[in-house]
Amino acid sequence: MEAVIEKECSALGGLFQTIISDMKGSYPVWEDFINKAGKLQSQLRTTVVAAAAFLDAFQKVADMATNTRGGTREIGSALTRMCMRHRSIEAKLRQFSSALIDCLINPLQEQMEEWKKVANQLDKDHAKEYKKARQEIKNKSSDTLKLQKKAKKVDAQGRGDIQPQLDSALQDVNDKYLLLEETEKQAVRKALIEERGRFCTFISMLRPVIEEEISMLGEITHLQTISEDLKSLTMDPHKLPSSSEQVILDLKGSDYSWSYQTPPSSPSTTMSRKSSVCSSLNSVNSSDSRSSGSHSHSPSSHYRYRSSNLAQQAPVRLSSVSSHDSGFISQDAFQSKSPSPMPPEAANQLSNGFSHCSLSSESHAGPVGAGPFPHCLPASRLLPRVTSVHLPDYAHYYTIGPGMFPSSQIPSWKDWAKPGPYDQPLVNTLQRRKEKREPDSNGGGPTTTGGPPAGAEEAQRPRSMTVSAATRPGEEMAACEELTLALSRGLQLDVQRSSRDSLQCSSGYSTQTTTPCCSEDTIPSQVSDYDYFSVSGDQEAEQQEFDKSSTIPRNSDISQSYRRMFQAKRPASTAGLPTTLGPAMVTPGVATIRRTPSTKPSVRRGTIGAGPIPIKTPVIPVKTPTVPDLPGVLPSPPDGPEERGEHSPESPSAGEGPQGVSNIPSSLWSGQAPVNPPLPGPKPSIPEEHRQAIPESEAEDQERDPPSATVSPGPIPESDPADLSPRESPQGEDMLNAIRRGVKLKKTTTNDRSAPRFS
């Protein structure tokens, strides 16, 4: 048993010694670790400094990317976020370096000294205990051997009292071996605990360092997200992103607003800007873009409606200021510009879409309510022209006469309640002129040679042949000379108007290639419903100066009423200033952009790509007599379009103008005067308001197409003596005087140019 115990104790002692030897042999490893950790911490400090400098430069790059106009704002933002994450990593790295030196290296160095002491102490304690135990066992074993020898001697002598002592000694030896074994086991445990404790201490020192490192490396996930963003932003370096395109659009929009916000505002600010940019392409597209298609009118409506049907281009005339919906489409104008399937005889049609009723005996034989609508105009004509045409509530197309056409043949325009900027104020006045002619048509005067029968020609009589029924054959030449004088004076005074009409409601941007001729510019001018005309020479110089610096519709009553008020305004545009004399056709200036063909010379801004506009010199009929009013007249020749509208709107027919006209204030007589001058005459069948419209209609009818009548082929028939009225002699002179006096407008009480009022 002693040998077994000895063997076990030797094994335990050997294990202890091995453990102690391992612990003592681990010191160089720990020391090397501490050394390398110190070097790492030193490098981390250097890295932190270098990282700080690197991130400063990185931030500058990110700021540059953010502030660059090359469309890298998103890239700069992502780089800034990445830089911020790297800043955070830098801070974590600082903390990691501090933890490495404070929590691992320095404590481990201190612990190494303790570990060495503990290992040495364990080895000493074990050696001491083992030596003591072995000494006791040896002593007991020695005593036991002595007792055994003594016992043998006693047995040989026959004595038996020594045996119990021997047994006790052997037990003591066994106990000592057991104690030694236990001592060895304890020593081994202590050695194992010490060795394990060292690693536990090391882990406790390493944990703060690892935690700081984990916190630092936790920023990697954010870097991964930012890296994906940068990858998507820089996927295609040769393609501009939407933000870069927006930069270009912003710059373009800024330049555009800078270019087009310079002109002053017109009276109607909403229509001025639009109409100024959209006011001139129609003169290049020489067609009446509103003269095709069908028109349907509600019987209860007093407004003119225009469909949006696009007209084809007619190649005959170039239109800058021609009257496209001045009330009637003259024969020559129809032949040159209307692409609709109507025959050339369909001249007696209102430009507001109504078919002008037949002037044959059948038409005016009916009652007033059922006859052609020129018979009975409502009393609303005495009011200022709020609606361009106040029509009575008649049937849809009235009585069917030779001049009637289906709705598909009636020219129509867009559904606007106001006339276009090139409208002539002839809608109502020409109706009254027709009204005046109806009794003459009933008189059955001789028809023109080569013309259709009287009844059919009355219905199809071109309105361009505006003649006076009150002119005697002997007075034709004198009246024509007076008319020519008035027209010549009016043409000289209307120097500005050829460009005014094309630039109606324009604030300066009126090039001919600005907008298409069918642009849906449907903004009506609120200041163009009152058009007053003047051929008085003393007002025209002042008017020219005013028109150069005003963006009000040039020929409206507003512009004349406020003429002196706006003389100090700066010029809105020099595009409309004329360089040559030319006749003018005054229009009710709505911001429309469709124009009918006209050869009227107009001074316009040169086209960007279309070249100069062909301009015809106006022809003034000086020696040609005016045809008297007849029941039927031949259609105007093809040269009518060139001469139509070359007279001032104020030009009256020769010999027309009643005796009472001279007594009427000139402010009450104009193309669109609120109250038309009364015309006392011997025709009781015509109501008073219709007689009032006669001189006005004659004047504007003559203005519409007088030359076409004068150049009509064939003999000029003389009017029937039954058709002559007693107001023949002084009519032309009084009318010319009224025209020369011009129009005097009443003062208004408001400064609002877009909403004039007349007291």
Curated annotation (Swiss-Prot):
Tissue: Strongly expressed in the developing neurons and skeletal and cardiac muscles in embryos. Strongly expressed also in liver, outer layers of the kidney, and in the Purkinje cells of the brain.
Keywords: Actin-binding, Coiled coil, Cytoplasm, Cytoskeleton, Phosphoprotein
Biased composition (Low complexity): 612-627
Family: Belongs to the MTSS family.
Biased composition (Pro residues): 675-685
GO cellular component terms, A-Z: actin cytoskeleton; adherens junction; cytoplasm
PROSITE patterns: IMD, WH2
Function field: Inhibits the nucleation of actin filaments in vitro.
Comp. bias intervals (Polar residues): 660-670
Organism of derivation: Mus musculus (Mouse)
Complex and partners: Binds to actin.
Annotated GO MF terms: actin binding; actin filament binding; actin monomer binding; identical protein binding; signaling receptor binding
GO biological process, one term: negative regulation of epithelial cell proliferation
Record localization: Cytoplasm, Cytoskeleton
Every WH2 domain range: 731-748
Domain remark in the UniProt entry: The WH2 motif at the C-terminus binds to actin monomers.
Gene3D superfamilies assigned to the protein according to its UniProt record, in alphabetical order: Arfaptin homology (AH) domain/BAR domain
Residues with Phosphoserine modification: S265, S266, S275, S326, S648, S651
Stretches assigned to coiled coil: 108-157
Name the UniProt record assigns to this protein: Protein MTSS 1
Start and end residues of each IMD domain: 1-254
Residue numbers bearing the Phosphothreonine modification: T262, T429, T607
Chain segments carrying region Disordered: 259-309, 331-354, 431-472, 569-759
